[in-house]
Amino acid sequence: MSSIKKISFVGIFSALATLVMFLEFPIFPQASFLKYDPSEIPALIVSFLLGPGVGMFVVLVKDILFFLMKSGDPVGIAMNAVLGMSFVGIAGLIYHRNKSRATAIKGMIVATLFATAFALGLNALIVPLYFEAPFELYLKFFPFILAFNLVKFGIDSVVTFFVYKKVSSILKLETVEGRSNNG
């Protein structure tokens, strides 16, 4: 793929990720600040196609654009960026070591578990500071944070798994099985 095509592809997927980030909704009414959006899906596709660094770049671009357009919450958007980059980066890194369907699944599972554990740790630090609340508030939200992140990254993984092959075939790039269509 030429440099111009890669730049165009990254731009299109960054814009797509930004747009779908507006489709946010809370999963748990008791923790309405935890909002699901499917914006890591385009970034994960890019990570599988072009590498983990490029996928992480898409996450960063979409979070900056979303912050500038809608979010007045720098802490929430920063956490979203850090967690999204860890998820997309780890999944892409594992996949690129041995491009296969099994490795893609393994990468997404490991990335989901890592990003969820990372979210729990970040929230343990941020919730008491951001909400100026005691650590007990974090403990109250712990089950929701755990479940939310498993669901979020799980949905992103499942959708990516089923969409990636079609997208890569359309673009005539590498498929999940590792075959190269670009000679």
Swiss-Prot record:
Record GO cellular component, one term: plasma membrane
Functional description taken from the UniProt entry: Substrate-binding (S) component of an energy-coupling factor (ECF) ABC-transporter complex. Mediates riboflavin uptake, may also transport FMN and roseoflavin. Probably a riboflavin-binding protein that interacts with the energy-coupling factor (ECF) ABC-transporter complex. Unlike classic ABC transporters this ECF transporter provides the energy necessary to transport a number of different substrates. The substrates themselves are bound by transmembrane, not extracytoplasmic soluble proteins.
Assembly and oligomerization: Forms a stable energy-coupling factor (ECF) transporter complex composed of 2 membrane-embedded substrate-binding proteins (S component, RibU, BioY), 2 ATP-binding proteins (A component) and 2 transmembrane proteins (T component) upon coexpression in E.coli. A stable subcomplex with both A and T components are also isolated. This complex interacts with at least 2 substrate-specific components, BioY and RibU.
Localization per record: Cell inner membrane
Biological-process GO terms, alphabetical: riboflavin transport
Residue stretches spanning the membrane: 9-29, 41-61, 75-95, 109-129, 144-164
Superkingdom of origin: Bacteria
Single GO MF annotation: riboflavin transmembrane transporter activity
Annotated family: Belongs to the prokaryotic riboflavin transporter (P-RFT) (TC 2.A.87) family.
Disulfide bridge positions per record: none
Keyword terms of this UniProt record: Cell inner membrane, Cell membrane, Membrane, Transmembrane, Transmembrane helix, Transport
Name of this protein: Riboflavin transporter RibU
Gene3D superfamilies: 1.10.1760.20
Membrane topology (UniProt): Multi-pass membrane protein
InterPro entries, alphabetized: ECF_trnsprt_substrate-spec (IPR024529), RibU (IPR025720)
One Pfam family it belongs to: ECF_trnsprt
Major location (coarse): membrane
